[in-house]
């Protein structure tokens, strides 16, 4: 059974950056994509991007203009998202998810518990 364990809640200042981790277990890390999704009340779910650890390939939501950088460490089966130049609009719950692509669209079948990010001075 696939399991994704995310790092804990973060409280950071505006203008700084943060790195959230997602450790995978129970499956071959390099055989699936890891996607990242932003959840904000009143805004639903927003796909940020995804990474294929087996080759380091990445896809990003063009609307986010370089807000996020996705990386993966195959030695520890851990994926990371770094968010930069943080503002209050970045306050949200961030989820990682295991995915596959079908007909050029990602499908996620296992989700992390979510990491709450609060950006406040």
UniProtKB/Swiss-Prot annotation:
Pfam families: V-set. InterPro entries: Ig-like_dom, Ig-like_dom_sf, Ig-like_fold, Ig_sub, Ig_V-set, IgHV. One of its GO terms (molecular function) is antigen binding. SMART domains: IG, IGv. One of its GO terms (biological process) is immunoglobulin mediated immune response. SUPFAM superfamilies: Immunoglobulin. Residues 1-112 form the Ig-like domain. GO terms for cellular component: extracellular region; immunoglobulin complex. Keywords: Adaptive immunity, Immunity, Immunoglobulin. PANTHER family: IMMUNOGLOBULIN HEAVY CHAIN. This is Ig heavy chain V region MPC 11. It comes from Mus musculus (Mouse).
């Amino acid at each position: 059974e696939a399991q994704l364990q995310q790092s804990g809640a973060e409280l950071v200042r505006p203008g700084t950056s943060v790195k959230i981790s997602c450790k995978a277990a129970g499956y071959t890390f390099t055989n699936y994509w890891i996607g990242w999704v932003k959840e904000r009340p009143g805004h639903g779910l927003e796909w940020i991007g995804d990474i294929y650890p087996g080759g380091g390939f990445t896809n990003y939501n063009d609307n986010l203009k370089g807000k996020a950088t996705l990386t993966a460490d195959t030695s520890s089966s851990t994926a990371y998202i770094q968010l930069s130049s943080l503002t209050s609009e970045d306050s949200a719950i961030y989820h990682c998810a295991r995915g596959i692509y079908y007909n050029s669209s990602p499908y996620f079948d296992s989700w992390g518990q979510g990491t709450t990010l609060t950006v406040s001075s």
